[in-house]
Every structure is written in structure tokens, then in C-alpha cells.
Amino acid sequence: MESTLGSDLARLVRVWRALIDPRLKPLELTQTHWVTLYNINRLPPEQSQIQLAKAIGIEQPSLVRTLDQLEEKGLITRHTCANDRRAKRIKLTEQSSPIIEQVDGVICSTRKEILGGISSDEIAVLSGLIDKLEKNIIQLQTK
């Protein structure tokens, strides 16, 4: 029987995010919005749209619509990069701070619930295996 590990991991991410979605509904954020804000907050300040798209794992054109919506909500600003006028840098606004705190809180509490009953050693082993899988995939992509 062939391994369904890739499908299993993809399904895990889907159900994990699906659990978080209703918990963030009061903030009026779609999954795309909160995933984008979460990643902007985790990356070094003023990342480019290209870097953010890579971090999230989506194509840049798909990201642009989400960034337009977040900018309309007053949660981010974008400005042209001084070195490359084609590139745009993304910055969180002060208005986004309380929302980011709530998003982080929901994500952290949900993570604790999901990982309940799993030892820190087991989590470390799983994280190590995921890192190895990612490295293998990256090596295969560069061949």
C-alpha cells in the first residue's frame, strides 16, 4: 500500500485552519486574511510581496487581492521599494496591533488544545521529521 503521508499532512493543515476559522470570525477575517496577517507579523519587518507569497506558499498575483483588502481595512500599508520600483514592501499599521494580538492568542490557544496529550519529545520528533521532509523536497526541486 502506498503512503498517503502528503495527503495526510495536507488534510491536517486544512482541518487545523478550519478549527481556527470560526474562532476568528468575530474579527471579520477570512482564512486568507488571518493567514496573511499572521505571516506578515512573523516575518522580519517590511517584507516584499514576493517574500510574503513564498512564506505563505501562494503565487504573488493571488496575494495581491488579499493585500488590497487588508489595506482597505487599514491593517497594512504598502510602499514602493527604494531599490526596485517594481517591488512593494508591506508594513503592519498600528490599527492592526490589537487584531494581531487576538489572532496570535487564538492560534496559540488552539495549538495548545490540538497538541494536548502529546509530549514535548513527540512534538520535537514530529518537527524534526517535517524538517527532513522539507529539506528533501527542496533538494529535489533544485535537481
Curated annotation (Swiss-Prot):
Pfam families: MarR. InterPro entries: HTH_MarR-typ, MarR/SlyA-like, Tscrpt_reg_MarR-type_CS, Tscrpt_reg_SlyA, WH-like_DNA-bd_sf, WH_DNA-bd_sf. Residues 2-135 form the HTH marR-type domain. One of its GO terms (biological process) is response to stress. SUPFAM superfamilies: Winged helix' DNA-binding domain. Keywords: Activator, DNA-binding, Repressor, Transcription, Transcription regulation. One of its GO terms (molecular function) is DNA-binding transcription factor activity. SMART domains: HTH_MARR. Residues 49-72 bind DNA. Homodimer. Transcription regulator that can specifically activate or repress expression of target genes. Belongs to the SlyA family. This is Transcriptional regulator SlyA. The gene is slyA.
